[in-house]
From Swiss-Prot:
Free-text note regarding domains: The proline-rich attachment domain (PRAD) binds the AChE catalytic subunits.
Location of region: Heparan sulfate proteoglycan binding: 129-132, 234-237
Organism of this sequence: Mus musculus
Family to which the UniProt record says this protein belongs: Belongs to the COLQ family.
Region: Disordered, residue numbers: 89-289
Single GO cellular component term: collagen-containing extracellular matrix
Name the record gives this protein: Acetylcholinesterase collagenic tail peptide
Length: 457
């Protein structure tokens, strides 16, 4: 059995109604309406213009389905028949007015006529049936986030669920208000002693700070390597003078030797420590030759003519007077035509092309200084009244003027004292603390105090 498509069935029903309407004899035999309505022949007689009675086909019962693909093979022949029926208008043959005859056979299809004017818009038809739902469309873009809705009533507490996995750490919240101080907890147990850390690297040497207070004694560490020998400690207090020993017997005098040849004159010896005795006045000498007058304006440092010697511009001048402690420091000076004062001998020296020559054989002594008799201090023999006698005039050793050196005598004991009074040796703030300036200070214990030294900022 052939099952027709709803669209095809609707087209067949339209054609069936059209064929029934076109047969008036069949309608009159079934429903006699000739008395109420004029017949089709009367209409043909009264109107010569009308050729045929054509009724518009009723609307289809079912809307045609929407085809996306190709047409169905069952619908293609039916659509062709429908197009042929719609395109073939029924022809009308004009004849003489006579009695209506039987309907003739259907003539051949004529040519399509001209397209008539567009008719008025018809009434709105009845809404058709709801079509089939189309395929789901492409999901659209998400719309903007709407305003949060009103908070609903709090629901009842549900059953305790299973503990879920720990979530990711959220952002740090704002700092809360400080809470109330809690109660003091119980003292915890003492932990195990941790391992001893490794020894760190030595840091950079810092600036010399002030001496702090002595801290508590630390634990004894491991024995390190033996360091270098330190400098001797401070000089102790002067002890009591010991008893004089017994003088030994004098030695036997040796035989007298032969007199030797007279040698060249030696260098001047150290000044005598004895008291000078004024001798007798000698006879008056012969008058000397007449000299020239060296009269002129008074010469001093502030005078502009100070640079010009009274003997002329070519005469040498003494640049400065140096103060040295001993012979070693005197030999280090290489300045020509200079005058130096030796503190150990208390005498002046002058340097020319031959070297350093003494120009003052009698040493200077301060007021109230007792001059010892010759042949006592400095001969290398310890005699009564002498604490020591090393036989040299060096004031930087442990024996100064036949007295033992002590802190406060004004002479720096080399190797024992850092300073003594104003004697710092060659040390200054610039050499003791490089990069600083100022004056060093000597404490009562003959140690250097560098507090007055300041650094450049």
């Amino acid at each position: 059995m052939v099952v027709l498509n709803p669209m095809t069935l609707g087209i067949y029903l339209q054609l069936f109604f059209c064929s029934i309407v076109s047969q008036p004899t069949f309608i009159n035999s079934v429903v006699p309406i000739s008395a109420a309505l004029p017949g089709l022949d009367q209409k043909k007689r009264g109107s010569h213009k009308a050729c045929c009675l054509l009724m518009p086909p009723p609307p289809p019962l079912f809307p045609p389905p929407f085809f996306r693909g190709s047409r169905s093979p069952l619908l293609s022949p039916d659509m062709k028949n429908l197009l042929e029926l719609e395109a073939s208008p029924s022809p009308c043959i004009q004849g003489s007015l006579g009695s209506p005859g039987p309907p003739g056979p259907q003539g051949p299809p004529g040519l399509p006529g001209k397209t008539g004017p567009k008719g008025e818009k018809g009434d709105l038809g009845r809404p058709g049936r709801k079509g089939r739902p189309g395929p789901p469309g492409v999901p659209g873009m998400p719309g903007p986030v709407g305003w949060p809705g009103p908070e609903g009533p709090r629901g009842e507490k549900g059953d305790l669920g299973m503990m879920g996995l720990p979530g990711s750490r959220g952002p740090m919240g704002s700092k809360g208000f400080p809470g109330s101080r809690g109660e003091k907890g119980s003292r915890g147990e003492r932990g195990d002693l941790g391992p001893k850390g490794e020894k760190g690297f030595p840091g950079f040497p810092g600036m010399l700070g002030q001496k702090g207070e002595m801290g508590p004694k630390g634990e004894s560490g491991l024995a390190g390597h033996r360091g270098p020998t330190g400098r001797p400690g401070k000089r102790g207090k002067q002890g009591q003078k010991g008893d004089s020993g017994i003088m030994g017997p004098p030695g036997k005098p040796g035989p007298s030797g032969q007199p030797g040849r007279q040698g060249p004159p030696g260098p001047p010896g150290p000044p005598s420590a004895g008291q000078l005795v004024m001798g007798l006045k000698g006879e008056r000498g012969f008058p000397g030759p007449p000299g020239r007058c060296l009269c002129g304006p008074p010469v001093n440092v502030n005078n502009p003519s100070y640079g010009d010697s009274m003997y002329g511009r070519g005469s040498p001048r003494v640049p400065a007077i140096f103060v040295v402690n001993n012979q070693e420091e005197l030999e280090r000076l290489n300045t020509q035509n200079a005058i130096a004062f030796r503190r150990d001998q208390r005498s002046l020296y002058f340097k020319d092309s031959l070297g350093w020559l003494p120009i003052q054989l009698t040493p200077f002594y301060p007021v109230g200084y007792t001059v010892k008799q010759p042949g006592t201090c400095g001969d290398g023999v310890l005699q009564p009244g002498e604490e020591c006698d090393d036989g040299n005039p060096d004031v930087s050793d442990g024996c100064i003027d036949c007295h033992r050196a002590y802190c406060g005598d004004g002479y720096r004991h080399q190797g024992v004292e850092d300073c003594d009074g104003s004697d710092f040796g060659y040390l200054t703030c610039e050499t003791y603390l490089p990069g600083s300036y100022g004056d060093l200070r000597c404490t009562q214990y003959c140690s250097i105090d560098s507090t007055p030294c300041r650094y450049f900022t």
